[in-house]
Structures are given as structure tokens and as C-alpha cells.
Amino acid sequence: MFVHLRNYTQYSLSRGALKVREIVEYCLKNNCPAIGISDFGNLFGSMEFSLSCVKSGIQPIISSNIRIEDENYSNCYLLLIASNYLGYKNLSRLVTKSFFKKKNNSFPSISISDLNNNNEGIICLSGGKDGVLRKTFEKFGGEKTSKINSILQNIFRENFYLEIQRLDRTNSELRFNDFILNLSNKNKIPLVATNENYFLRQDFYESHEALICISEQTFIDSEHREKISRNCFLKSPSQMIELFSDIPECCQNTLNLAKKCNILLEEKKTQLPRVVTEEDEDSLLKTQALQALENKLKYDPLKDKHKKEYHDRLITELEIIQNMGYSGYFLIVADFIQWAKKNNIPVGPGRGSGAGSLVAWVLTITNLDPIKFGLLFERFLNPERVSMPDFDIDFCMEKRDEVIKYVQKKYGELNVAQIITFGSFQARAALRDVGRVMQLPLTQVDNICKLIPYNPANPVSLKELVNDDTQIKKMINNDKNLRTLFEISSNLE
């Protein structure tokens, strides 16, 4: 049996092209009991991956390919796998540390010494083509590589594995593999076979190349760019077993390693920090909101004439907020926005559906009077809403860190985290970007994009379009470049 441990998903931003659902479907098709993801320097996909695997009866193996940088190493990686929940917490700490150490445009990275205090529950793989051992071996030779191996072995002990890969059978790869085999036998370190999986099938190679070119702002036909192997696709277990038929234990060890991993991430209910107050949160919010409304109306005689309308709307909103348990959330947001304004940090007027809240306006979370502009509170919050509402707040770019530090200090660093929003290719954007890296005429690509229906609420996929639109189907059947354009774009979409 064989378990893939190195899979780079789309969460390896602009580098990996594997989709989580594709990995799960691959496992079901090939009867794989377990599989891992190993995105570069992050754990963005770990929750989606874990939930999707468990739903399909597959054991998820969560890891990250962490960059190592210090006076001895540069641009090399270690694969760190969480074997249990403590390991996941330690891995999260290391990922966080890598971003805190990031300077200017450098890549997030850690040093070997950072592993000393955060290794419990973590399994370490020595790294593949860009691993610490391979890079050291190619630059300094076997003696120094053996010393680095000893350091890693001392840190991770029985949770340290040597990796062996067979991507292109180059002289460099063959020499290193011979060294690794000897090192494994000499030091009794288990050996695991891995493959660098960036895309699903071998025929997805061109699509992945286009993705890299889009990211690096270069062209597919560029001679001087670095290219990855065509073998960086998700091979079947039988293909991997055949590839390493002369050392079958390195495939069996992937299954043994998988058995050591026992972590299932679960979605948790929203837990907001409590507002420290003698009153309960509902009463405090109501008191503050009513007083703030009085202050707003007092200085505006036109609004004062509609006092009952404002008061009734405020009470209605407060009842909904209280019934849904979001009083504390409003108080927390109002607090750090008011703090920012008092400290001369520019704050935006408010965006999105949150601008429809009268409570938000009177508490100065937003600067827009929703009654004056006819904005609906129900778009922001209503009893039938499942997901938690959120305010879109803009802070001055140069001073936003001060606001974050204030919130961390008030509620505790362990209770504050930053979030990320992921963008994905839509049909037109995919065609334009792929057309550019293919160096197709801009007017030709633009004319094709005009044939794509624009419907953000219900976007049509390129595959659906090719099947349903006879004009587009005829165009790509008569032009090889256009056919390639649509094939690559639909894979990246």
C-alpha cells in the first residue's frame, strides 16, 4: 500500500493546482485509506480538507511545507506533519512565527532552532527536491548533510523520516538518492517515498505551467524560467509502488506514518470574547445605543422631527441583535473603532450590508444614516441568517497595526487572529490571463471574452459554455490555439 504525503492544493497560492475535491475523488477511486496535503508555508486548506476527507471516510494528514532560512540555509524546506492536535497547535505556531519573521518582500520562514521548542506531536520529513538535506548535499556534500541530518534526528527522534523521490532520474537526483539510502541504513532512519504533486493528471501539466506564468508575469514560451517536472502529478498507488519496487519498505512506511496521525479538525461554534462590564451585554448595548441616538438627534433638528421613526427602528434592531446573541460583537467593534478615531487613526465610513444598521451608525461603527439613505437592516442581520454577520471596516494602511495591537492587548493575543479572503478564476479572467501568458493577440482574446455571459450571481463555467454555445464550439474546433486556451482556462477556473 502507498499513501501520498505531498500534495500542493490551490491553497499553495499560485503554485499548487490540486483542488480538495479532486484529492478526495482520487482517494475514493483508488481506495486510498489516507492522504495528506502539504501546502507551502500555510494551513489555509486544513479545515476544508479535513471535513471533506472525513465526510468520505478518508483519513486526512495535515502538514505544511515550511521554508527554512538562517545563516546556514537558504530557500529550502522541511515537511512538518501534525500527528495529533498538539502537533497541529505547534505547527500553527511555527507557521505564525514564519509570518512574524517575514521582512519586506521576503518569504515567510523559520530557522532550525525554532523547531526545538515546537516539535512535540510533529512528524518531520527531510524534504524532497528543495529539502534541507538535498540543498545541503548539492552545495556542501555528504559530510555537512550528515551533520544536519543528526540535528534533525535529535530534534524529532522517532518522528523523523528521510524522503526519497524519483521525479526525473537526473544525475543530481540519483547521487542524492544513493546518499539517502546509505544514510537511512547507517542510522536506522525510516525511509518514505514521496512525489511532488502539483496537479491531478499528467495532461494538466500545461495548465499548471500557465498558472505559474500568470503568477510570475512571464510567458509559457519563455526560455529562462524554471520549470517543474511533468511527473509532478498525482500518480496511482500502484504506479508509486512500481516506481519504488526495488525498495518496497519506503512505500509501506508511508502507510505506517499515516497510522501515527490522528487528527480530525471540526468546525466550532462562534465564540466571541466577553465584554468586561458590570451590566450584561444586552443592557449595555441598549444603554449606549439609546444615549448615542439622543446625541445624534439633538444636533440635527431635521432628524429630531422623525425621532419616533429612529427610536422604533433602533429598538427593533436591538431586539434582533440581542435575540441572536450579537450584542457583545457590536460592543467590541464599536470599542476599537472609537479608540481608533480618538487616536487620530482614519477609519472608513463603512461598506457592505453593515451600513444598513442604525445601531452601527449611532455607535459610530459606520458614518451613514441608514434611514436617510433607505438602507435595510435585514440585509445585514435577520433571524433567518445562518452565518455570522461582519462589518467591512477600512483603517488607514499605515496605522492599522496599531488597532490590531489594541485589540490583542484588550482581549488577549490568543483570542485575536487575522483572516484571509481567497479569490478564484472566473471564466473571463481565466481566459484573459491564460491568453496573455500564451501571447495570443489581445484583440482575439477580448473578442472571445465578449461572448462569455456576464452573470456574477450565477456564473457559467467554460466547460458548460463549450458544450452549450455552438459559436464558441465552432471557433475552438477551427483554431488549435483557441482550443488550448479553453482547455487550460477551464482547468484553472
Can you say where each PLM-predicted feature lies in the sequence?
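Alpha-helical scaffold/interaction cores of sigma-54-like transcription cofactors
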Residues: 1-493
